[in-house]
From Swiss-Prot:
Upper taxonomic lineage: Eukaryota, Metazoa, Spiralia, Gnathifera, Chaetognatha
Organism: Paraspadella gotoi (Arrow worm)
UniProt: heme b b566 binding residues: 99, 198
Protein's UniProt name: Cytochrome b
Needed co-factor(s): heme b
Keywords: Electron transport, Heme, Iron, Membrane, Metal-binding, Mitochondrion, Mitochondrion inner membrane, Respiratory chain, Transmembrane, Transmembrane helix, Transport, Ubiquinone
């Protein structure tokens, strides 16, 4: 009798086998499908480095900035742990935006449960990143927390009380920092749980492919074809994170955040981390507080609408020439909003942000009708 393989002996090994070894995968995956596994890698790095940082961090408004300096100067290898954690967040968002962009371009949003879970994860990750940005308690951390939390006051009737509840007082202070640290420690584990659900939904429906067609009869096992490809991606990701952390450690940071928080001195220009800038530019482009908050929320929540606007012959934009160019115009608008969000609130940056914000939302309004128009002429 043939000996049973180890990966079939227990239910746990069977789950791992179904995810990493015998998973049926389309044979025409491109490198754009590597970003999902890279997100898992960087999330693991963030969890490990974050736990080590939490061992030495003090969530007290008088000590937090000094505790970060202590980690950099006095803790064994603390400097590299802190730099990898800070720069790893940037690489996580690079992979995340590429992953979302790939899903939008190739029509992966038609796997509705997987897409909705992914968008929820995106919002949760942005919340975790904002909470983490506040923890060093530098100038930009303090004033960024003040500005962003104040946005909740735009909610009618309950906004003011909600802000005071978040602050734990009448201004951003020690209670706020303690709450943000607690949530920042918790949320990544919720993200990990959500990622498992995301993978579960993905493997229930099967992966999309560049052509956006059903290819159940033309699949190959994940290992060794795509596992080797992922390992190559892991190597490059490790290389870039280490390269930035060793040679350009503060390239993606904000200089004002190396100054201890001072409630009596407002920075000349309050800027969040670069991965929030596109939403921040949309917020600033609307000359009304409530309108700006709604614009910021819609910039994220509009991703939920994509499965509702699709009723076409093909999933992938690669098969629609007009939609293909329209998608790249959307990418340009995203990049220009990111650049505009880092500029002072003055002309011509405000006007440019308004134009690019309109183009950003126009994509979601017209992408469905454009494909219907092209289907008519096919």
């Amino acid at each position: 009798m043939m000996k049973e393989r180890m990966r079939f002996k227990s239910n746990l090994f069977k789950i791992v086998n179904g995810v990493l070894i015998d998973l049926p995968s389309p044979r025409n995956f491109t490198f754009w499908w590597n970003f999902g596994s890279l997100l898992g890698l960087v999330l693991s790095i963030q969890l490990v480095t974050g736990i080590f940082l939490a061992m030495h961090y003090s969530c007290d408004s008088l000590l937090s900035f000094e505790s970060v300096c202590h980690i950099l100067r006095d803790v064994n290898e603390g400097w590299i742990i802190r730099l990898v954690h800070a720069n790893g967040a940037s690489f996580f968002f690079i992979c995340l935006y590429c992953h979302i962009g790939r899903g939008m371009y190739f029509g992966s949003y038609m796997q509705t449960k997987t897409w909705i879970m992914g968008v929820l994860l995106f919002i949760l990750v942005m919340a975790a990143a904002f909470l983490g940005y506040v923890l060093p308690w530098g100038q930009m951390s303090f004033w960024g927390a003040t500005v962003i939390t104040n946005l909740f006051s735009a909610i009618p009737y309950i906004g003011g009380d909600l802000v005071y509840w978040m602050w734990g007082g009448f201004s951003v202070g020690n209670s706020t920092l303690t709450r943000f640290f607690s949530l920042h420690f918790l949320v990544p584990f919720l993200v990990s749980l959500g990622a498992m659900l995301h993978i579960f939904f993905l493997h229930t429906t099967g992966s999309n492919n560049p052509l956006g067609v059903v290819a159940d009869s033309d699949k190959i096992p994940f290992h060794i074809y795509y596992s080797a490809k992922d390992l190559l991606g892991f190597f490059f990701m490790f290389f870039f994170i280490i390269f930035i952390s060793f040679l350009y450690p503060n390239l993606l940071g904000e200089p004002d955040n190396f100054i201890p928080a001072n409630p009596l001195l407002t920075p000349h220009h309050i800027v969040p981390e670069w991965y929030f800038l596109f939403a921040y530019a949309i917020l600033r482009s609307i000359p009304n507080k409530l309108g700006g908050v709604l614009g910021l929320l819609c910039a994220l929540l509009v991703l939920f609408s994509l499965p509702l606007t699709h009723s076409n012959f093909f999933k992938s934009n690669a098969l629609y020439i007009i939609s293909r160019y329209f998608f790249w115009l959307f990418i340009v608008s995203f990049l220009m909003l990111t650049i505009g969000g880092g500029q002072p609130v003055c002309e011509p940056y405000v006007m440019c942000s308004q134009v690019w914000s309109c183009l950003y939302f126009t994509y979601f309004i017209l992408c469905g009708p454009l494909r219907i128009f092209q289907d008519y002429y096919l």
